[in-house]
Amino acid sequence: DGPFSDGATGDRYRALEGMNAVTRDEAEKALRAYFGNVSEIHFVQESSVPIEVYEFGLTAGGYSMSAAVTKQGGQVLYALSDADVSETNMTAEQLLDTARAFLLARGYGAMEMRYYSRYEGILTINYAAVQDGILLYPDLVKVQLSMADGAVIGVEAGNYLLNHAPRVLPAPSLTEEEAIARIGSQLTAIAVRLSVIPTAVSEALCYEIRATDGADTFLVYIDAATGAERELMQVVSDESGILVM
């Protein structure tokens, strides 16, 4: 997966605050609208793990899925398919555009693709929310698409619903140049941008510095307030996608 794809944990779903409760019928209607090509849907059960939801089984675009819709707000928490896709008729580049358009049309706002992986005929893409050009890694959405026909066959929006809200972010205490100086002489910076990353207890505004040692590429996260190195990850690119370790 991409950086911070595990996200943060908690019980306050910030993206749902202020939203009204929905009925089971309203949740089903929201799920139909979300996928748009639902040929069959049935209610499974109510659940409270990790949040109060209505669970459904459905078939959309010829793919069977299980899905959950939040009782508060009627938002899709997840939709998962066990489809076995072996045929590949579309490229990753084509599907990156498809997935971004899918999210935009469903009201997720400014999102940016960070990393993706391919397993057989299924492409999984991580998108992070963006606020004023700053990446919000806690507000992550994963989208799965069939490379056979471009259908969206999976969504994991739990991190997004848990964390997404406008932030009041402090101005960095360090400049980009000062942050780059913290990564050490063995690495050469390629690109720098501000990002919010999850921590054990909260979040931190960091400079995300993409850097290389001449052979490998790394992501170094320098705390924009203290200058401390928060994270160091290696970027791996191959035929399966772009991942971090």
What are the language-model segments listed below?
Residues 1-245:
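Long, terminal "pre-/pro-" and other extracytoplasmic accessory regions
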